[in-house]
């Protein structure tokens, strides 16, 4: 009985770790799509802009 509980606990921990590692990239993409900067506003990198073009510190 003790081994079965330990095995079940290990399986739950492993599946939780896998689910968290798969969810992080999706969460990052969602945040980037919500938090992107509109055309004409200041930016620092191409990834800051909704269309991905940052020229002369402004989204194009």
From Swiss-Prot:
The presence of a 'disulfide through disulfide knot' structurally defines this protein as a knottin. Disulfide bonds join 36-50, 43-54, 49-59. Expressed by the venom gland. It is found in: Secreted. It comes from the Eukaryota. Probable insect neurotoxin with ion channel impairing activity. Does not show activity on 45 human receptors from 9 families (5-hydroxytryptamine, adrenergic, dopamine, muscarinic, histamine, neurotransmitter, opioid, sigma, and gaba(A) receptors). In vivo, does not cause paralytic or lethal activity when injected into sheep blowflies. When mixed with U3-SYTX-Sth1h does not cause paralytic or lethal activity when injected into crickets. It is noteworthy that both sheep blowflies and crickets are evolutionarily distant from prey species. Residues 1-23 form the signal peptide. One of its GO terms (cellular component) is extracellular region. This is U3-scytotoxin-Sth1a. GO terms for molecular function: ion channel regulator activity; toxin activity. Residues 24-29 form a propeptide.
């Amino acid at each position: 009985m003790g081994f079965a509980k330990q095995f079940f606990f290990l399986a739950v921990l492993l599946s939780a770790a896998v689910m968290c590692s798969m969810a992080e990239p999706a969460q990052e993409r969602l945040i980037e799509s919500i938090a992107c900067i509109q055309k004409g506003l200041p930016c620092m990198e191409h990834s800051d802009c909704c269309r991905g073009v940052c020229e002369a510190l402004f989204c194009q």
